[in-house]
Every structure is written in structure tokens, then in C-alpha cells.
């Protein structure tokens, strides 16, 4: 009987995937297909929750197979992320429109990312205070305590490292190692290495233009090939979203979520407030927040379901271009946003945990000097946070260890981590796109016609198949 039910569950997922494929062939909007996949995954996951326990053999076996589609899609994206960061930064330097204002553009992007992260930290502090969250209120089961102990063991060296030592760790000693994504700070390592190559290209272009032209041709060719691979992978987005959402909802522990409901509610309240601030920033520059939401929906939906900012990078860059951002700035903003100034994972989350832990070590979390110190530490620690699953935990440990706070609390939230991480990741991606749009607007390079054109969306022929 279990085998029949397992096959039935898998067959229904494949049937919905078949419907999505049929809609693709009929050139149904990419956004609509992603939204349908998201909704279908949630509804189907809830139905499975109603009929089966999350830890039942039927769910475990069927979701293992469904996971091939979901995790397989995310792995394809992760496969291309490091090459895409590398070639995107290099190609940004080879584009004249960017190199003319390189210093100003870099400063604006980084400044926007860090400033919004500081604002996000303040919102996280406020959310923890308003909802009166405290570490002692978090229930600690066997799994949570075990995970907390594992975190303390895994990051023992990081706890001992000072903030300056943690900053030094951002500098790549072996760029080829970072291209494999082995270090937690590999993304920023690749960004730094690529930037050095880009600056070197600018110098060679002045003294040896022929050599620079050869290099530019190679970079442009590689960029075209990498982006073609990206396009092929992005066509799989609706199917990946369907599988990921089905598995996430079907295997979630609803009882644990209800037990920690106040923390979940506070987290999403903070995330929503910060997203509204993103829209206010755009409105303040004379741009329509509604247009932004409509065009950004596919990439935000993917980031929400997949929980990987790095995996969303290809769609992030494409979406910025559809919002009128020059390709060079889009590459910079998207790549920098992977490892610097993540509003959700590196801003709101560490701030909330720090405020919750502070009373247990005798620190008043509402003391102005502590709040200011916390915001500064979070802003600095936001450099180098990985754009893949686990980035928020890494960011929280960086902040807590810098404040000399215990880090085990991060393990106590394991049961609701996937649910909260979805919203955090979507906010991360939104923050990087807003930094690109804001920078383009300030430098006068934003194409307002493209931004306002409803036909300029991710629903391109490339996405249709």
C-alpha cells in the first residue's frame, strides 16, 4: 500500500509538471507559471500534511524522489553561480559605461547594501523588543540541543577569532579554492579576485590596448556562453519551484512552527517592514514600486522557495536588466549582494538573536550604546556571508561571537529555520536589486523607458523555451 501511495504522490507532481510544460509550449507568461507552481506546491503540500504525518514512510520516500527535481534544479543553479560571479564582475569592467564611473558606482552599490543592512538590523532589534522575544522562551528539544552543540563545535574557531581576524578571512589566499565554493566566504573571495583582474585589465587597456582587446574578446565570449547556460537552467524554474514548495510544506513540523509562532510572526513582520522600506527607497527616487514588484516577482518567488540567494543570481541580473539597469551595474549589484549586506540573513536575523540573548548575559538590549554597537557589528559582519543555505546561521555566529555571546541559540531554531529562511532569502535578493536600481538612478544610467515598459519582463522568449 505504501508503494502505491508513494507512486501516486510522485505521479501527481509529474502531472502538474506536465501541465506547466504544456503552458510553456503555449507561451504562457513565465511569471504566471512560477506563481501557479508556487500555489500548486503549497496546496499539494498542505493536502499531504492532512493525510500523512511529515515523518511517515510514504512522505519520506515520495519526497526523496520529488527532491530530485527540486534539489537538482538548485544544484544546477549553484553549479553556475561561481563562474557567473567571476565572469559577471570581469565583464562589468570591460564595459565602458561602467568603467567611466567605476569608483562612484562601486561606492554607491556597497553603500546602499551596507546602509540597508544597518536599517534591517534596527528593524530586527525593534521586532524582538516589540514582540518581547527572549532566549529562555525558546523550547529546547533533543534535536535542537544536539544541533546547538554541533554548531558550537563546528564554529569553535570562529568564536575564538576576533572581528579583525574575521575580516582578514574575507581576503582570498587561493582564488581557485574559492571558485569551488569551499569556504563560507568564497563568494566575496571570488568578487575580490575578479575585481583585481578587472582593475588590471583597465591598466593594460591604457598601455597595451591590443592585449586588452584580446582579453575583452575572451571575456565577452565566456560571458555569452555562461549566460546561455543560465538561460537553459532558468527554463526549469517553474518545475523546481513546484518540487521545492511541495517538499517544504509536506515535511514541515507544523506543531513546532505553532510552538515558536511568536518568533516566526516577529521575523516576518520585520521582513515585510524592510521590504516596504525597499519600496519607499524606489518611490523616493521617482520610480514606481508597483512596477518593481510586478517585474521582480519571479525572482523573489524563486528566492523564497529555494532559500538560496546565490542560486537566484542569474534571475537577479536578468530582472535588473528588465528594470532598466545597465548590464555592468546589474552584474556588480547582483554579485556584491551575494556576500555583502544581505538584509534578511545578515541584518534582521542576527539582530533578533542578539537582542534575545542579551538579557541572559546581563546586557540590557535596549541600552542605546548596545544598540549602536550591535548595528555597527552587524554592518561589518555582513561582509562575506554566503549566499547559500546556512548563510544566516553563519552571519548570526559572526555577530554573536564578536559580541562574546553564546551561539547555541541558533541551533534551537532548527525546526522553523526553513520557514523563516524563505522570507529572509527573498529580502536578500530584493536588497541587491534595489541597490542596483538606486545606483543606476543616481548615476543617471537607468533606462526609465525599459523600467516602465510592461513588456520588458523576465517573460522573454528565452524563458519561454
From Swiss-Prot:
It is found in: Membrane. One of its GO terms (cellular component) is plasma membrane. InterPro entries: Na-dicarboxylate_symporter, Na:dicarbo_symporter_sf. It comes from the Bacteria. The keyword Transmembrane helix applies. The chain crosses the membrane at residues 3-23, 34-54, 73-93, 105-125, 184-204, 224-246, 263-283, 338-358, 370-390, 394-414. One of its GO terms (molecular function) is symporter activity. Keywords: Amino-acid transport, Membrane, Transmembrane, Transmembrane helix, Transport. Its main location: membrane. It holds the Pfam family SDF. It is a multi-pass membrane protein. Mediates uptake of L-cystine, the oxidized form of L-cysteine. Belongs to the dicarboxylate/amino acid:cation symporter (DAACS) (TC 2.A.23) family. This is L-cystine uptake protein TcyP.
Amino acid at each position: 500500500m505504501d508503494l502505491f501511495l508513494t507512486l501516486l504522490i510522485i505521479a501527481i507532481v509529474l502531472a502538474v509538471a506536465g501541465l506547466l510544460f504544456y503552458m510553456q509550449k503555449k507561451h504562457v507568461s513565465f511569471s504566471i507559471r512560477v506563481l501557479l507552481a508556487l500555489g500548486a506546491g503549497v496546496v499539494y503540500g498542505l493536502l499531504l500534511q492532512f493525510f500523512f504525518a511529515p515523518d511517515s514512510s510514504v512522505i519520506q520516500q515520495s519526497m526523496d524522489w520529488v527532491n530530485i527535481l527540486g534539489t537538482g534544479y538548485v544544484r544546477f543553479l549553484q553549479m553556475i553561480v561561481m563562474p557567473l560571479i567571476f565572469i559577471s564582475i570581469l565583464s562589468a569592467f570591460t564595459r565602458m559605461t561602467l568603467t567611466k564611473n567605476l569608483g562612484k558606482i562601486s561606492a554607491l552599490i556597497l553603500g546602499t547594501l551596507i546602509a540597508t543592512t544597518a536599517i534591517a538590523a534596527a528593524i530586527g532589534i525593534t521586532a524582538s523588543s516589540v514582540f518581547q522575544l527572549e532566549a529562555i522562551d525558546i523550547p529546547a528539544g533533543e534535536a535542537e540541543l544536539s544541533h546547538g552543540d554541533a554548531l558550537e563545535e563546528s564554529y569553535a574557531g570562529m568564536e575564538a577569532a576576533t572581528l579583525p581576524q574575521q575580516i582578514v578571512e574575507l581576503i582570498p589566499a587561493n582564488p581557485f579554492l574559492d571558485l569551488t565554493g569551499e569556504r563560507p566566504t568564497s563568494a566575496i573571495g571570488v568578487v575580490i579576485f575578479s575585481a583585481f583582474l578587472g582593475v588590471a585589465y583597465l591598466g593594460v587597456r591604457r598601455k597595451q590596448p591590443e592585449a586588452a582587446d584580446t582579453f575583452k574578446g575572451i571575456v565577452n565570449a565566456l560571458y555569452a556562453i555562461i549566460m546561455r547556460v543560465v538561460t537553459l537552467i532558468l527554463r526549469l524554474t517553474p518545475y523546481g519551484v513546484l518540487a521545492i514548495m511541495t517538499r517544504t510544506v509536506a515535511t514541515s513540523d507544523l506543531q513546532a512552527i505553532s510552538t515558536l509562532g511568536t518568533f516566526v510572526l516577529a521575523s516576518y513582520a520585520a521582513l515585510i517592514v524592510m521590504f516596504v522600506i525597499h519600496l519607499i527607497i524606489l518611490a523616493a527616487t521617482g520610480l514606481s514600486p508597483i512596477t518593481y514588484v510586478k517585474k521582480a516577482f519571479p525572482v523573489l518567488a524563486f528566492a523564497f522557495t529555494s532559500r538560496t540567494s546565490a542560486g537566484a543570481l542569474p534571475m537577479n541580473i536578468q530582472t535588473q536588466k528588465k528594470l532598466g539597469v545597465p548590464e555592468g551595474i546589474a552584474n556588480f549589484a547582483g554579485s556584491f549582494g551575494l556576500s555583502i549586506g544581505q538584509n534578511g540573513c545578515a541584518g534582521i536575523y542576527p539582530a533578533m538573536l542578539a537582542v534575545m540573548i542579551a538579557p541572559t548575559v546581563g546586557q540590557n538590549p535596549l541600552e542605546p550604546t548596545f544598540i549602536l554597537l550591535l548595528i555597527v557589528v552587524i554592518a561589518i559582519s555582513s561582509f562575506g556571508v554566503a549566499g547559500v543555505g546556512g548563510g544566516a546561521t553563519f552571519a548570526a555566529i559572526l555577530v554573536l561571537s564578536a559580541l562574546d555571546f553564546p551561539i547555541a541559540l541558533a541551533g534551537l531554531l532548527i525546526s522553523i529555520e526553513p520557514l523563516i529562511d524563505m522570507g529572509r532569502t527573498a529580502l536578500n535578493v530584493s536588497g541587491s536589486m534595489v541597490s542596483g536600481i538606486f545606483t543606476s538612478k543616481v548615476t543617471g544610467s537607468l533606462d526609465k523607458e525599459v523600467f516602465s515598459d510592461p513588456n520588458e519582463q523576465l517573460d522573454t522568449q528565452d524563458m519561454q523555451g
